């Protein structure tokens, strides 16, 4: 796919009801299916997928109005690339380029940056409203008493941070996603769990809650044990993205693959040449407080032991999943 092809504007706003937009139509159909499923005595699984807040940022005007007068101007330091980060870590914002209101090269104006941030948040509010409608229908039908609900995203998104727009990097903002789980068997007040988990843990979690046995061995682990404080958790998560950027949708164009592991205190990324399997670039970032992903520390003598430990994690992951 040519992500710099002919596109319209990045932002589309219309004073129309939610159902005039695709995600609103998805919600309407999901509500109908819940009505139908509630009349059946059979267990059901319903997946509801939304496009927003992916580009283009399209939403009913009422959600845009929430952020119309808010300021999204950040400090200049927040938009700088990490010190000593290799060029391969970045891209030219291909996901954003090609829209009629975005230059093919160079930076965005402050006005356009702020407009894009407002539109992104407006799309998040649009989807928040759609999820609210689904939860309201479950309660209306009495299904919330025996339904497990999982809300998650497939990737993060840069809005100018680290001088990036879009996704498809191994940085924290692209790899970290929201994950909310509701199960009626837990009566206590909601809680936030700060342990590191992976999206591959969702399926074994659902089968566990439903009393089902997975059909085969899984890489993920049930989060039930973590929720109930019954296990020392793995506290590591892996992600990967290819280069060049255009290879995201075409494996034959890949020349390098970047593997990253996130632990409590560190993010470590190794870039491999696909032809030779040699490591071409390394990135080590402290993830604590204000230092998070500000400087690539790889190669510094004081971090040799940490790098060796994290590299072993990546090698084990790579060897296990690339067979």
What spans do the regions from the language model cover?
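Carboxylate-dense, calcium-coordinating segments in secreted/extracellular and ER-lumen proteins
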Residues: 293-297
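Hydrophobic residues within well-ordered, non-membrane alpha-helices that form the packing/core
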Residues: 33-34, 135, 227, 314, ...
């Amino acid at each position: 796919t040519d992500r710099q092809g002919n596109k319209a504007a990045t932002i589309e706003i219309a004073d129309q009801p939610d159902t005039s937009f695709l995600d609103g139509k998805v919600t309407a159909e999901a509500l109908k299916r819940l009505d139908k499923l509630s009349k059946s005595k059979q267990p059901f699984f319903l997946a509801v997928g939304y496009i927003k807040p992916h580009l283009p940022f399209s939403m009913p005007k009422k959600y845009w109005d929430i952020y119309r007068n808010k300021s999204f101007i950040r400090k200049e330091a927040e938009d700088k690339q990490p010190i000593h980060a290799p060029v391969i870590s970045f891209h030219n914002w291909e996901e954003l380029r090609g829209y009629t209101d975005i230059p093919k090269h160079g930076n965005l104006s402050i006005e356009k940056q702020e407009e894009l941030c407002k539109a992104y948040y407006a799309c998040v509010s649009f989807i928040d409203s759609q999820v609210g409608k689904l939860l309201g229908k479950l309660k209306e039908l009495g299904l919330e008493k025996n339904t497990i609900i999982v809300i998650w995203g497939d990737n993060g998104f840069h809005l100018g941070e680290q001088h990036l727009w879009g996704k498809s990097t191994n940085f924290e903002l692209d790899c970290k996603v929201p994950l909310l789980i509701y199960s009626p068997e837990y009566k206590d007040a909601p809680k936030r769990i700060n342990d590191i988990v992976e999206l591959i843990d969702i399926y074994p979690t659902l089968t566990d809650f439903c009393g089902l046995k997975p059909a085969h061995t899984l890489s993920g682990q049930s989060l039930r044990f973590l929720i109930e404080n019954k296990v020392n958790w793995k506290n590591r998560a892996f992600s990967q993205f290819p280069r060049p950027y255009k290879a995201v949708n075409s494996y034959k164009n890949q020349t390098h693959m970047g593997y990253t592991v996130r632990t409590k205190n560190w993010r470590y990324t190794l870039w491999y040449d696909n032809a030779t399997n040699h490591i071409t670039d390394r990135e080590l970032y402290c993830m604590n407080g204000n230092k998070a992903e500000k400087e690539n520390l790889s190669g510094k003598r004081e971090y040799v032991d940490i790098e060796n430990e994290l590299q072993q994690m990546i090698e084990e992951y790579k060897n296990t999943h690339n067979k």
